[in-house]
Amino acid sequence: MDKDLTYQIKELKKEKNAIILAHFYQPPEIQELADAVGDSYYLSEIARDCKEEVVVFCGVRFMGESAKILSPEKTVLMPVSNAGCAMADMVDEEGVIKLKQQYPNALVVCYINSTAKVKAHCDVSVTSSSAIKILENIDNKEIIFLPDKNLGGYIAEQFPDKNFIFWDGYCKYHNNIRAEEIIELKDKYKNAEVLVHPECKKEIRDLGDYVGSTSGIIKYATNSKNKDFIIATEEGILHELKKNNPNKNFYIPGGKILCTDMKKTTLENLYSTLKNMENEVIVEDEIMEKALNSLLNMHKLAEG
């Protein structure tokens, strides 16, 4: 890590009254520098509750938007303005409106991996760590879930009494994980436990000893007496896993699962963003007002 640049970023942070948030999929040097590292739900709480006036969000676009919607009075910056999420872009507001017309009695639940414009048409947002708790607190029997059909399928398995209508979206990195890659690793490391993110396909989830969010995977591996783990999610999580468990071994199916947009953040663009107060996240007032409802409901139902 560039110590001089790191020092300058820390000084700028004090000067600007800023907090740096980083997702588990961010590069190791960014995670090390961040004030808080976590999954989407945890980071949305920090963004909402922090006292700092400036939030620098090291992640992808929908995360910065969610932070701005939850804290409109704060300045939210992103080191890379074009760090997107292909899954979030698979659904548009016209598609949501059409589905709502088709299923007028359905509650519209969106994965937080959605754009602000889509959230504006949804009743509640969920994250992979909060989804089950939230759905437990929802009485509706008919649910439109978007955009991730894999996470939606996992949630639907926990609620057989509810009827789910899915959007045909997915995370290409999780969706591309193949069962053979996991079986191959299981043959090599006989006692390894398989920890799977619910954005994976059902055939991958079925191979898992545990299915859960990034924070859930880290907690499970840390508490387990096992020494070997096969990790079916983006490889950025390995930094926190190895940091918490230096004597344990972690293996990625296929050897590599890398989200290119999550890896766009660098110390250089983080420094530039703070120094010049650039790449501010702007969400139109009308969209922000409508989208806020789904995020407030997320926190209310997850904490209820």
UniProtKB/Swiss-Prot annotation:
According to the record, cofactor stoichiometry and binding are noted as: Binds 1 [4Fe-4S] cluster per subunit.
Q: Where in the cell is it found?
A: Cytoplasm
Q: Where does [4Fe-4S] cluster bind?
A: 85, 171, 259
- Which Gene Ontology terms cover its molecular function? 4 iron, 4 sulfur cluster binding; metal ion binding; quinolinate synthetase A activity
The protein's matches in InterPro entries, at most eight in alphabetical order, are given as: NadA (IPR003473), NadA_sf (IPR036094), Quinolinate_synth_type2 (IPR023066)
Q: List the disulfide bonds.
A: none
The domain of life is Bacteria
A single GO CC term for this protein reads: cytosol
Q: What is the reaction catalyzed?
A: iminosuccinate + dihydroxyacetone phosphate = quinolinate + phosphate + 2 H2O + H(+)
Membrane-crossing residues?
Answer: none
Keyword list (alphabetical) reads:
4Fe-4S, Cytoplasm, Iron, Iron-sulfur, Metal-binding, Pyridine nucleotide biosynthesis, Transferase
EC number(s) on file: 2.5.1.72
Question: Which pathway?
Answer: Cofactor biosynthesis; NAD(+) biosynthesis; quinolinate from iminoaspartate: step 1/1
Which positions does UniProt annotate for iminosuccinate binding? Answer: 23, 40, 111-113, 128, 197-199, 214
The processes (GO biological process) annotated in the record are: 'de novo' NAD biosynthetic process from L-aspartate
Q: Which Pfam families match?
A: NadA
Does this UniProt record's set of keywords contain ATP-binding? no
Question: What this chain does, per the record?
Answer: Catalyzes the condensation of iminoaspartate with dihydroxyacetone phosphate to form quinolinate.
Q: Which family does it belong to?
A: Belongs to the quinolinate synthase family. Type 2 subfamily.
Q: Which NCBIfam families match?
A: nadA (TIGR00550), PRK09375.1-2 (NF006878)
UniProt-recorded name of the protein: Quinolinate synthase
Q: Which gene encodes it?
A: nadA
